[in-house]
Design a protein with these regions (language model features):
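Generic preference for flexible, low-structure residues
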Residues: 10-13, 63-66, 70, 110, ...
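C-terminal beta-sandwich/jelly-roll accessory domains of carbohydrate-active enzymes
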Residues: 124-165
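C-terminal capping/lid segments that line or modulate ligand- or cofactor-binding pockets
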Residues: 1, 21-130, 135-136
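Short, surface-exposed linear patches
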Residues: 2-6, 116, 153, 161-163
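Generic long, charged, amphipathic alpha-helical segments
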Residues: 3-27
Length: 165
């Protein structure tokens, strides 16, 4: 695909000019909309791939420069444009939605399927730890209660507040 690049979808197809042209930039709002559309229409693995590429560019650029950029180079991942721009922030909500993780409260988690990303993901929120792997998800609540879900589908996981009281 001409647009599907190492760090996201390019704004336009690269021209023959070897310099930094606008076509080499990853437009974040557009990429996020495409990822949301992929997710909405059931293309979870493709959405996860696109989000992984975006996150890789964001983290590499942030580690190098200590700042978020307006956009990122689609082939190199280097930051482009304005520093500390809101446009360049990581799409955390979309990342979690693609992961199938909905945190209702620190004591109630809803899981939708398994981790589509190529690596294990650990999310920590107010004392609750969620370990998302390819074939199972483990939720460890702040009081130590642990639940592991190893079946596909949607699962509501809640902390039993009667234990330890």
């Amino acid at each position: 695909n001409l647009f599907w690049k190492s760090y996201g979808l390019a704004s336009v197809v690269k021209s023959s000019d070897p310099g930094e042209n606008p076509g080499s930039a990853v437009n974040f709002p557009l990429n996020v909309l495409v990822a949301e559309g992929l997710l909405e229409y059931g293309f979870k693995s493709e959405a996860a791939d696109l989000i992984s590429r975006l996150m890789q560019g964001i983290t590499q650029s942030h580690l190098r420069e200590g700042a978020f950029r307006y956009s990122y180079h689609s082939d190199k991942g280097t930051g482009m444009g304005e520093r500390n721009a809101l446009n360049g922030l990581a799409p955390v909500n979309l990342f979690l939605k693609t992961l199938g993780l909905q945190i209702v409260t620190p004591h109630e988690i809803i899981l939708h399927g398994f981790n589509p990303y190529p690596w294990p993901v650990t999310v920590k929120y107010r004392g609750t730890t969620i370990l998302c792997q390819k074939d199972k998800t483990t939720v460890i609540f702040s009081d130590g209660q642990t639940t592991t879900v190893s079946e596909e589908g949607t699962h509501k996981v809640s902390m039993d507040r009667s234990s330890g009281s």
